Structures are given as C-alpha cells and as structure tokens.
C-alpha cells in the first residue's frame, strides 16, 4: 500500500470542490445521446488529439459522484477526471465516456444500463478496442465501478476506484453493492467474482464521508486472490481524493498496460 504526501493537493482540492456546473468548460467534450428503456439520456465524450478512424482506440468509462447527478450534461464534467483531462487533452491517449446519472439514483439499475449503453455507442462511433476498455469512478461512482465490474466480469481490462466502497455510508443507505448473496462477505465475494481484474484503489485517510476502511478491506481481498491490485491512501486528505488520484503520474501507464485478452 502506498501513502503519498499531500503536497499541493489541498489547494487543488479546494478549487475542485468549489466548481459549479455553470462554470464548466465543455469545449473538450462532445455531447451525445443514447436511448434506454424508451428514454433519452445525454452523455459526454472526450476524443484524444489525433483521433481518426484508421485504428481502434482504448476507451475509459468515467462514473461521477452523487453531487454531479442531474440531466444538464454539464455537472458530470465538474469533478475528477474531466477537469484533469482538460489540462491534459493534448497527450491523453484514450476516448473517455462520461454519462450522467439522474437525480436521486445510483450506478445500478437504469443508470448502469445507460452508462453501458453510452460505452457501447462510443465503441461503435469512435472505433473502440474491446480489449482495451477501462472503468473508473469517484465516490458514488467508485461504488459504481465495483457494481459494474461485479455485474459484467470480464468486460474491462482494468479499473481505478476513488473513494468508493461496498457498504453504505451513513447518509446514503441505498448506496451499496447490489447482488451479494445473503451471508457472504461482500469483499471476498466481489474479489472472487471479478478476478483477475487489475484494480488500483485510492482513498483519503481522513475521509469522513466514505470510510477508507472499505477500500483497505477490498484491497486485502483482492490481494488474497493474487490479483494485480494497488492501493494508495493519501494522509490528511478527506473525501476529495480524486484530485491527487487522477494526478498520480503512474496511474495511466499502469492502466493502459493492461488488455482484456492478456488476463490470465
């Protein structure tokens, strides 16, 4: 387990947390729509510089947190990976799909179907490589990463989970991993279900919204499976650990080194 110093992340986190949807720069993110169960849902997609249709491209599916839910197709760009992408648009090598969950929903049920429909739409429209599909999310979206990985084992080449969990936080009893059999340890069950999926887990040591203990327990369960798993905990960082997480220099080389067809 890695523990990183806070360095400049406190100031960056304050800036990130103060962002409002109305202030979001959408210039790097094209708007698209998908239909699920008779309803239209908007999502955003980032295309790397130099994208063309002559080859297939890796695709990252990003799941936002609870504060970015809605239907404006803008708030989903305000935290986490999208702001980081804006500053690294020139050299990020993958397509990024950014769905938006409706208010008062979580990343299971219809929002999960919608996110995967947006991913499928982007695979077809932007020549996605099905052996290089990646999944990441923060907070509620971190829960969503584990949910989608559990519901669709073998779909993704690697995942990155930021301040997520499996058990519900005190203020959101509906937010938890769905489908765990009664009486089963959720961490051991999930680790066995998704193996050998490579995972990098991030959490703030001072997080008082989603306890880091769940990430520690998931890390231990994946280690017990012998999987390629990393855990980075940021000392002194509260819930906004997505700022240092997505700025971790080794994250993207590690993620893109994995292919689904190379998993054991």
Where are these regions (language model features)?
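Bacterial N-terminal signal peptides that target proteins for export
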Residues: 1-9
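Hydrophobic core
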Residues: 13-18
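A domain-start/cap signature at the N-terminus of enzymes
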Residues: 19-59, 136-138, 180-182, 216-220, ...
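Structural recognition of the beta-strand scaffold that forms the well-ordered cores
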Residues: 44, 59-63, 95-100, 132-136, ...
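Gly/Ser-rich "nucleophile elbow"/oxyanion-hole loop immediately N-terminal to the catalytic nucleophile
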Residues: 50-55, 104-140, 153
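Active-site machinery of serine-nucleophile hydrolases
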Residues: 59, 63-118
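Hydrolases whose catalytic domains are alpha/beta-hydrolase-1, hotdog thioesterase
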Residues: 144-148
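The feature captures the conserved acid-bearing segment of alpha/beta-hydrolase catalytic domains
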Residues: 158, 163-246
């Amino acid at each position: 387990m890695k523990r990183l110093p806070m360095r400049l992340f406190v100031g960056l986190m304050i800036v990130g947390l103060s962002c409002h949807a109305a202030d979001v720069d959408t210039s790097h993110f094209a708007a698209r729509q998908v239909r699920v169960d008779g309803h239209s849902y908007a999502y955003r997609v980032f295309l790397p510089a130099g994208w063309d249709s002559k080859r297939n491209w890796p695709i990252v599916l990003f799941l936002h947190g609870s504060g970015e839910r809605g239907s404006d197709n803008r708030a989903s760009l305000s935290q986490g990976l999208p702001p980081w992408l804006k500053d690294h648009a020139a050299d990020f090598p993958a397509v990024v799909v950014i769905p938006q969950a409706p208010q008062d929903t979580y990343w299971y049920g219809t929002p999960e179907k919608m996110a995967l429909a947006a991913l499928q739409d982007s695979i077809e429209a932007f020549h996605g490589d099905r052996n290089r599909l990646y999944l990441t999310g923060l907070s509620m979206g971190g829960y969503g990463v584990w949910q989608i990985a559990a519901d669709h084992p073998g779909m993704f080449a690697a995942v990155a989970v930021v301040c997520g969990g499996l058990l519900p936080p005190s203020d959101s009893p509906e937010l938890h991993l769905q489908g765990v059999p009664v009486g089963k340890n959720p961490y051991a069950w999930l680790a066995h279900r998704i193996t050998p999926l490579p995972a990098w887990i991030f959490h703030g040591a001072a997080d008082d919204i989603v306890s880091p203990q769940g990430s520690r327990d998931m890390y231990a369960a994946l280690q017990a499976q012998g999987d390629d798993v990393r855990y980075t905990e940021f000392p002194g960082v509260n819930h906004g650990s997505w700022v240092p997480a997505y700025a971790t220099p080794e994250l993207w080389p590690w993620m893109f080194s994995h292919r689904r067809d190379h998993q054991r």
